[in-house]
Amino acid sequence: MFLDELPEFGPRVLEVLRQPIEDKIVTISRAQGTLTFPANFQLIAAMNPCPCGYYGDAVKPCTCSAGTITKYQKRISGPLLDRIDIHIEVPRVAYEKLSDQRLGEPSAVLQARVETARQRQRERFTEKRASHGPSANQGATQLDCQITCNADMRPAEVRQFCQLDDTGRSLMKSAMSQLQLSARAYHRVLKLARTIADLAGAEQIAPAHLAEALQYRPRGVGG
């Protein structure tokens, strides 16, 4: 689902997204009762940095006051931002880049890399289910069957499949303090780092994979 001009949506509309993003279900309550539906989707959103759109621009000055910018950005709550794994600032594109005739990496190559990473994840969780065996706890096995990709991992799977070396643990410890990461953000960063490692074809999460995952977090949002 793509939401353009994210701050222009009403606060109640945006806050309703928190449950389906986190739990992949949506609950509707009416006088006659409550119904729960599956809501497994990928959220992509875009927004300007301020109402005029030029806050932080290197060429055109912003015409908004500091208070206006703060009020505009606060339309999106910290808990909602905390549930979005990848935050990217898109600066003005220079003429030289727009007119460059060199082609980037072909989409077919990117697609193949993603498909390989997803296959790696499916095999990882299939092996985990097989290791339980028929005598494993039935409830746990049913939950495991729902996991097909890194995004579906719960804390137990994160601890098993997202282990860090000493350098990675030191980096994560510093990031928890400097970026004020919540417990939710901690697990989301590790899952994203595991995906970055899978895309690189790496068996273990390297510090570089973790550093890339951390740079996608919004600054100052801890949940």
Where are these regions (language model features)?
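Hydrophobic positions in the central parallel beta-sheet of the AAA+
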Residues: 1-2, 88
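Walker B catalytic acidic pair
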Residues: 4-5, 16
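Basic, amphipathic alpha-helical bundle interface domains used for macromolecular binding and assembly
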Residues: 12-223
